[in-house]
Every structure is written in C-alpha cells, then in structure tokens.
Amino acid sequence: MKKPWKCMALALLSGASLFAAESTKPNVLLICVDDLKPAIGCYGDTFAKTPNIDALAKRSVVFERAYCNQAVCAPSRNALMTSLRPQTLGIYDLGTNFRKSRPEAVTVAQHFRASGYKAQSLGKIMHIGHGNGEDAASWDVPHFHAKTIQYSLKENQTPTREGALFDNKRPDQLPRGAATEMADVADDTYSDGQIAAEAIRRLQAAKSDKQPFFLAVGFLKPHLPFVAPKRYWDMHDAAKLPQPERLTPPDGAPSFAPQFGGELRNYADIPDGSKPLSAELTRHLIHGYYAATSYMDAQLGKVLDELKKLNLEKNTIVVLWGDHGWHLGDHGMWCKHTNYEQATRIPILVSAPGAKAARSQALIETVDLYPTLAELAGLPARDGLDGRSFAGVIRESSVKHREFVTHVYPRQNMIGRAVRDERYRLVEWKKPGAESTTAEYELYDYQTDPGETKNLAASQADVVKSLAVRILAMPEAKPQLKTTAAADASKRPVSQHDRTQMFARRDSNKDGNLTKEEFLTGQPDPKDAPARFTRFDQNKDGILSRDEFVQGGADRTKP
C-alpha cells in the first residue's frame, strides 16, 4: 500500500491521474453485477430498494447513458476485461473463450498486475459455464467461484438443467428448476452472501499488504433464478410494482429482432415457447427481480462498509457496473438478448479519490472502462483497444465523450449492428460480409418515442442514411468464431424442449404453424433444408405443426 508511484511527475504533467495529491497507488474495487438494469433508486426508480448503491452514488459520477456492447453475459464480460467488442473478437456466444480469438490479449487485470497490483476475482467476473471458464492468467490467486444456480428449499434441491449448464456439465434429461425462491434463511445461504463474506476477508488481508489491490467482485443477482431471503421479498409490495405498459414488439420491427424470454422459459414454472405470461406470473417475476436486486444491494453494502472501516475508501477507485440490461415484460419480452434499450442500457458508477460526485449524460460503453481505470490509476495506456478513456468526464462531468455508442446482437445467420446517439438508435441487420444493400434496418427516435413503439426506418430514410454512414465506417463484424468445442456441440441431438424454443422463434406470425418460408429462413444448410422440411411434414399439408417440427427433429442437430 505504501509503494511510491513510478513516473509520478509525468502523470502530474499530463493530467493523467486524479490522484495528484496522493503518494500511493490507488486501489481498485470493481463491482460487477449480473443482469442489473438501471432499476435502482439513484437512477430514478422509485420502486427500487437499493440504499447501498444509492449511497455509493452520492460520492460517484453516475453515468445516465451507459451501454453494454452486447446484451448477454460472456460477450459483455469479454468487452469489460479486454476492451474488445464482440464484433472484433468474433465471439457472440456463451461458450467460446475470448483467448480462442485473441490468445495474446492483455486483460485489464493483467495490465494492473504488470504495474505492481495484486489482482483477485470473486464470484462472476468472466462467464463460467456453457463450456466457458475463468481466465487464470488474469489473477494472482485462483478465482473464488460461487454457484450461479442455487436454491435453499428442500423441494428445489434436485439437480437442474440450468445448474448443469453453469457447472459445465451436460444437462441431458435433467428437470428444469424453479424461476423464483423465497426462503426465510440467512444472507450467506445464497452465493452473493458468500461472495460478500469472501470479499471482506480479501479486503482485510489487503489492509496489511504492501501491494495495491485490483479486486473484482462479481455478484450473481438479479440473474435468474430470482432467489433471495424472504425479508428482501417483504421489502416490496408486489401490487405496487410497475407493470409493462406495452405487451407487443415495436410496430414494424423485423420478426426476428425481438425475443420472448428463451432463458426464462428454461425454468419449470414458465410457459414454453412464446406464449404470453399471465398478469399474475408477470407481477411475481417483477417482484422477484426487485427482491433479488435488494438482496444483492445489501451484500454490496457489507463490502463497502468494510472498505470504509479499514480506512481504504479514500484511496480506492470503486466502480459499479451492470453487464447488461433486462426486459421485464416490456414489449412482451423477457431477459436480455436484444438490441433494444431495456436490454442494452446499463448502470455505471465511478467513485474516484479526488473526483466530485456528479451525474453525467456522456455516452459511454463497457469497452471504455478498461482504459478509464488505467488512466485514473496513472497506468500507461495500451494500444489496440476498442475503448477510449472517459477519465476526462470524471474530472468534468459536463464534457462529451462519444457522439454515439455501438452494440451488437446476433440473430440466425445475421448480426444486428447498432449505433445509439443522444436521440436515435439505428440497427443494421445483415450477414457478416454481405453488402449493405442487403440490410434490414430498425430506427427508433427516443425524443418522440421513448417507449420504442414504432420502427421508423421505412418513413425516415434520411435519418437512416445519416446514421448508416457511422455503421459503414466501422470494421465489418466478424462472424462467430468456430471452435472444436462449438463444432462438437452442434453435433449433439437437440432436446424436445430446445426444439420447442426453436419453433417459437421461427413462427414469425405466431399462428402455431411454420410455413416453408418460415422454416427455411436463416437455415445453416440452405441446400439440404428443403428436403428436411418435406421429411418433417408428416401429413403433407405444406406446413409444419409444432408437433411435427419438435418430433421430426428431436434426434437431429439441424433446426
């Protein structure tokens, strides 16, 4: 903790650090929260019970317009750790490790280690599961892992499909688990309580350590399942929580752009496919999300209290980051996995010694955190990153950072590349490498339509053209990297449950049948797919019923 800064004079001259008055390197406490949207008190959500995040906000710069780079766990966390966008890595899935694309990448933790920091990680930092794992090269000590899928009640103790996937085991015929749990248990019964306790132990050890620390603490809630001790459920009156106002996708949106909660529908008490959820179930799930968020907030509070108790607060950069947003029934959608506002807007709070608390309207992206932390700590900048430092915004919250942010999401064999500026979002859907003339567009105007109710691409060609120039100026998105593990996975039989989900995605008009056109759209083997359609069509009526699709292909690997 007492090690003098190297190149202090250079840092002072360049204005590269906020810590000009300090004689020691600042510590870094990076708080990562899984599936946390800005449903937080300090972001104006009056229903949220998040006193500890709100207290942190009072000494932080709160970024009102922060966005992830892809609204799903692994690619978003890759962007955080490497400052490389998913389209740069060519990784959009959960199971492909970023080092398959960039084995030489230096993560933000490695960069701090090279500058004399002790780097440690707890909970969920990189995505663990679905064939992916933690990055041992980033940390000085082995990663502290906690279970993502965890229950307390006896009736929920059976091994589940989702639990197996997050444990990197084959789900086979395991049952689906419960989407929620409310048990009258202690906080440390569930993983976030255990993560907080371990974080406190690491802080206590760091107090007497000669090295500055880079401690990444990843809380799991409010990720599904929504499990939390009963008292956190009791903090919220379910009858008063906000309910979705619109239950259908934006008018004019491409049929493939929305999603209706495939992840949520992997749980036992949720209807299959794209069937709408009842008002009662919707209310219960929203209650669960808010309860799980309050539970996480309480665990975070314990860690921040210990930081202050140990007198480390004044020389520690604290960052709170949500990996992506979450649909809570808006537009009939659940979970993340889209390019829409509710899935892509995230909370980012930065508390830095020497910086004043403020609120910023600057547009920032997840990839920007790596170079920002390096600059705040006085570390040298690294070349080859997609992100750019917003330390200047932390010094003066009114300055601009970017004209627009970018994010992506894959659908079928296409990539949806999006640009979001202060007013609009444009999404370009096309195959990687295809001509821009083949693209299908979505355009939303948040000044006149903050609820994203209508795709304006067809009626505002001039706006589409001006924003498309920004997309065309970007490097082309790489297609998904193919690995041996991914190839092996593609050869495994597809379960009936998964084929039911596939059917729901392909049934674009939601009439309960697939036309040949719906079946063939986006098939990975367009030459062979027509014969497969004919084979599945048992009654030869020219359409596929749900049963024909599910039963006809349940033992096959192609959709």
Spans of features found by a protein language model:
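Formylglycine-dependent sulfatase
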Residues: 2, 7-441, 450-470, 493-495
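Short, flexible loop/turn segments with low-complexity composition
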Residues: 247, 386-387, 479-489
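Extracellular/periplasmic ectodomains of large secreted or surface enzymes and adhesion receptors
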Residues: 277-280, 483-495, 506, 516
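Amphipathic regulatory helices of Ca2+-sensor modules
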Residues: 515-527, 546-556
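Primarily EF-hand calcium-binding motifs
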Residues: 496-510, 529-540
